[in-house]
Amino acid sequence: MKAYQMKIAIKNSHPPIWRRFIVPAGLSFSQLSIVLNGVMGWCGYHLFKFEFYHLRLNIKEKYEDFIGLGEEEQLEASETIIDPFMEQEDWFSYIYDFGDYWEHRVTIEKVIEDYGPSYPVVLKYKGETPFEDCGGIYRYYDLQEILKDPSHPEHENMKAWTEGHFTRDYDLNEVNESLKRMALEKKKSKPMLQNEIYEE
């Protein structure tokens, strides 16, 4: 089975927060978003989009919601398979949660022709998953400083907020078990998406 080894990293995270993983070929971009959220540790209840900059192409959850926005070509994530893009591009952006705007750079490291499992696997990682709905990467770092300072006026409120709903350590084994349980049915793309997107 063909698969792709990738590395996803949160933009502007210092030190970098990243995951290296393998994902089977033949998935739609909607399914890839589920994988990326699982790999990163996101809950997955926010909107998302994929951006391929030099193609001037956005792939989003619901195409009809974005008609007429911007000059980029728009494709619908559930109707577009990943393979033509994974085999011709070096990287792309994945944006999760348009409010907090978690921007990730996803590097396509290599194509694997003889991948055994039918499910994604995280190989390595660095950094814990940020708190969901905290306001983005910079607010996340502000929040960490508040949590370290018991004298800060927001310390108790922020401590209760994180402990009550959002605190979780990144457990590699647990993440991989969750990914293994994913039923990722492969999709067929519309012929146009494979044959015409790289016609020039």
Annotate each PLM feature:
Residues 1-200:
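Short linear regulatory motifs enriched in tryptophan with gly/pro/ser
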